Swiss-Prot record:
PANTHER family hit by this protein: APOPTOGENIC PROTEIN 1, MITOCHONDRIAL (PTHR31107), CYTOCHROME C OXIDASE ASSEMBLY FACTOR 8 (PTHR31107:SF2)
Similarity comment: Belongs to the COA8 family.
Organism: Homo sapiens (Human)
Recorded name of the encoding gene: COA8
Name this protein carries in UniProt: Cytochrome c oxidase assembly factor 8
GO terms for cellular component: matrix side of mitochondrial inner membrane; mitochondrion
Keyword Ligase: no
Compartmental location: Mitochondrion inner membrane
Stretch forming the transit peptide: 1-39
Length: 206
């Protein structure tokens, strides 16, 4: 996967996701979505102010009782998730939410750094090839000089080869984290079912 593949689709739209309805979500959103999730519209000024070392801190409506997916981050191209915290959040639900938040921060940091490295090395590669050809950074018409697809394929191949081990470790950790999240989601689901059963028993006894 190239760094740019971490981008999000469907920018500028607002979607309400609720449990019990079949709705398509990108892999990242599926990993973080829970009882409810809403997609915030993209805001240009907000993206410009995003820091490369953290997740964008957009603010959903105060009365919202769902998770919100924000606009794509300027550096990682990932949509940050603002997790809803219910008043009666159980210790197990809190542990799941914090695990999701920590995983999101980790994922954000990796792709922000990786995309920055990708862009920097890409520009250096283009400049080097143009210099070898005796060409400048601008064409005669003043446009930015570029390389053809075959020449850029050499860069992509070299970049992927050089970062193979880094991507391998990332994928390994990504699967571990998602397995842990899925495990705790199962525990939370069982906890909620058990609580509902206890409430029904209390009503019957009364």
């Amino acid at each position: 996967m190239l760094p740019c593949a971490a981008g999000a689709r469907g920018r500028g739209a607002m979607v309400v996701l609720r449990a019990g309805k079949k709705t398509f979500l990108p892999p990242l959103c599926r990993a973080f979505a829970c009882r409810g999730c809403q997609l915030a519209p993209e805001r240009g000024a907000e993206r410009r102010d995003t820091a490369p070392s953290g997740v964008s801190r957009f603010c959903p409506p105060r009365k919202s009782c769902h998770d919100w997916i924000g606009p794509p981050d300027k550096y990682s191209n990932l949509r940050p998730v603002h997790f809803y915290i219910p008043e009666n959040e159980s210790p197990l639900e809190q542990k799941l939410r914090k695990l999701r938040q920590e995983t999101q921060e980790w994922n954000q940091q990796f792709w922000a750094n990786q995309n920055l490295t990708f862009s920097k090395e890409k520009e250096e590669f283009i400049h080097s090839r143009l210099k070898t050809k005796g060409l400048g950074l601008r064409t005669e018409s003043g446009q930015k000089a570029t390389l053809n697809a075959e020449e850029m394929a050499d860069f992509y191949k070299e970049f992927l080869s050089k970062n193979f081990q880094k991507h391998m470790y990332y994928n390994r950790d990504w699967y571990k984290r998602n397995f842990a999240i899925t495990f705790f989601m199962g525990k939370v689901a069982l906890e909620r079912i058990w609580n509902k059963l206890k409430q029904k028993q209390k009503k019957r006894s009364n």
